[in-house]
């Protein structure tokens, strides 16, 4: 298998991830495939990237905000001779702010509880905030609709097996 850099939804790179396939599913890494297949072997019915959740809706801001111009804007400005400053200038943005969305790697159900498994090889800078927002989303799901969930972030098959033990113990204690 060839090791490559691949892009994921939030435009962050997974470095040295090996794309791979199994059961007709294209996984973004070997670890995702291993975790998925392990869940199958243990008798679960995992879904790979089952759904994308909107954690914060996109919006049109009322507050004026300024950001550096894009490379295209800078190139156009320099070409037109409007301002020959070589660095990027601040420009007012009026465009819609895109929402924050999150797609968990794996979801399955166990005794009426939805279980989310986030398979991590390496973290990226966006993941931490999305993880917090998703856990808050799951809390609200329970408070408003009484839907129980559990969330696990695993970095190895060993951690997955530990997560399975926790899931089973949690179910037995009720």
Feature-to-residue mapping (PLM):
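Electrostatic, structured charged patches in enzyme active sites and in nucleic-acid/phosphate-binding
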Residues: 1-174
């Amino acid at each position: 298998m060839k090791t490559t850099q691949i892009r994921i939804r939030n435009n962050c790179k997974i470095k040295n991830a090996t794309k791979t396939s199994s059961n007709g599913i294209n996984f973004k890494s070997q670890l995702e495939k291993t975790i998925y297949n392990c869940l199958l072997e243990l008798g679960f019915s995992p879904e790979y990237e089952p759904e994308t959740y909107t954690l914060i809706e996109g919006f049109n801001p009322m507050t004026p905000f300024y950001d550096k111009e894009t490379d295209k804007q800078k190139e156009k400005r320099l070409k037109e001779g409007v301002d020959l400053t070589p660095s990027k200038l601040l420009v007012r943005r009026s465009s819609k702010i895109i929402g924050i969305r999150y797609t968990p790697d794996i979801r399955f159900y166990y005794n009426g509880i939805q279980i989310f498994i986030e398979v991590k090889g390496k973290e990226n800078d966006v993941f931490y905030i999305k993880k917090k927002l998703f856990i808050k989303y799951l809390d609200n799901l329970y408070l408003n609709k009484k839907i129980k969930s559990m969330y696990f972030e695993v970095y190895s098959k060993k951690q997955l097996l530990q997560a399975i033990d926790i899931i089973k113990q949690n179910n037995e204690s009720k």
